[in-house]
A protein has these predicted regions:
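Active-site-adjacent beta->alpha loops and helix N-cap segments on the catalytic face
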Residues: 47-50
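Canonical Radical SAM [4Fe-4S] cluster-binding loop centered on the CxxxCxxC motif
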Residues: 1-18
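Short beta-strands and strand-loop turn motifs
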Residues: 5, 38-41, 66, 133-135
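Alpha-helical packing segments of well-folded alpha/beta enzyme cores
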Residues: 25-29, 53, 120, 150
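A structural motif corresponding to the C-terminal lobe/cap of the Radical SAM core domain
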Residues: 16, 58-190
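Conserved beta-strand positions
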Residues: 6, 40-42, 95, 166
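Short Fe-S-cluster ligation motifs
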Residues: 25-42
């Protein structure tokens, strides 16, 4: 996404663990710390892994409660995915919502469509998962009425938005916006 500079912290060779490795790690941590509670710290949990790991946790009867960070995905428009996630112990998801305006999402290079966001929120909520959405106002090029669209989106979907965190846009030093400020109408002053 054009606002993000997380990729600067990744070193060459970063990779996602395979499902079998994750299952082994969960068992190890359960035994070592006598815990059922897990936070998978991936700022954008891959949809295929979300689907596969949820199913495996159920199959392995791990009896855990877990959370992670997700993007809204068109590949997750299947109610069974959310039922499996809940059955596996998923109880809370942090979603990168960013904006309730399609044009602004496109400026941010987010492939997400607003109808997919609504569907993901509804399905996960109906499955019993708490939804926390994160967004911000003031992205370069966003108009006042487009910022209002975010408020209206949240109000329209309040039955399925359980908590939220909004802030003002902060230009990250290594974000694509910082690398190409003129493309986004950003100018530096000294």
């Amino acid at each position: 996404c054009t606002f993000c500079d997380h990729f600067q912290g990744y070193v060459e060779g970063f990779r996602t663990m395979q499902v079998d490795q994750i299952i082994d790690e969960i068992r190890f941590l359960q035994n070592k710390y006598n815990t059922r509670y897990f936070h998978f710290t991936d700022e954008s949990y891959p949809p295929a892994l979300f689907r596969k790991l949820s199913q495996r946790i159920v199959e392995e009867k791990l009896d855990i409660v877990w959370t992670t960070h997700m993007r809204f995905e068109e590949t997750l428009l299947d109610e069974q995915v959310w039922k499996d996630a809940h059955a596996s112990g998923c109880r809370y998801l942090h979603f990168g919502f960013e904006s309730g305006n399609q044009r602004v999402l496109k400026l941010m290079d987010k492939a997400t469509k607003l109808d997919a966001i609504e569907t993901n929120l509804r399905m996960s909520s109906e499955a019993g998962i708490w939804n926390h959405i994160m967004g911000f106002f003031g992205f370069p090029g966003e108009k006042k009425e487009e910022a209002e669209d975010s408020k209206h989106f949240v109000l329209k979907n309040r039955e399925h938005v359980h908590s939220l965190g909004f802030m003002t846009y902060v230009l990250g030093k290594y974000s694509p916006v910082a690398f190409e400020p003129e493309k986004y109408g950003v100018s530096y002053y000294k």
